[in-house]
């Protein structure tokens, strides 16, 4: 296990200006990140971070705030609140959340978008009630909740659902690799998807607060930029309007590949 100081030092060496603490971050590593805050700040925290003592390992869907199960929501509520407070303590102003999944008996077929939309309606209502309870905590800590798009059909909220959930302290969080997987599988409702062309003053409330940058070939994600088929030029407007732009490569991505990905993005976005 790398120490927090080592990770922070490597990020500084690679030219990154801020960190996102991921869901694999341990309590021991947090000490190291705190020791480097004067050199590289923490901009965002990915729930659930640090790894809860009760959990065997980090996982972004240990708890699901978007659930029709009362007990599941109650447990998730406690941990999301802790993450909001932890983010504020680290000086971060955003918490990235995998909200939950729209469950059904069996699995959604690849083309079963209509059934997915219908089953999501109840979850939207339940999740909105949870968000209402979170708003005072978010506002008190000056932390925005970022709802990440997920790379599977049952992932919640979907593009057509997130617009009914956002507000001053709740915003979309766009994972570019996940977005590509969803597009390749034709899961995105063309009438309501958030596109670069939609980022106008009257719709900026739907502009993502942050981006997770990764590439994808369609059946995978978290590749370095330039190794997949994500249309990064089309995402430039999103990046310009986002508060946080976070590289999120897979753990097995080598340092030289990561550096090439950074350079690819700099050329693409003329940075």
Would you name each region that the model predicts?
Residues 23-43, 79-94, 159-165, 188-206, ...:
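Short amphipathic alpha-helices and their capping/turn segments at secondary-structure boundaries
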Residues 65-171:
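Active-site acidic/histidine proton-transfer and metal-coordination neighborhood
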Residues 17, 93, 209, 243:
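Short acidic/polar active-site loop segments enriched in Thr and Asp
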Residues 4, 76, 80, 127, ...:
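Aromatic/hydrophobic pocket-lining residues that form the small-molecule binding cavity
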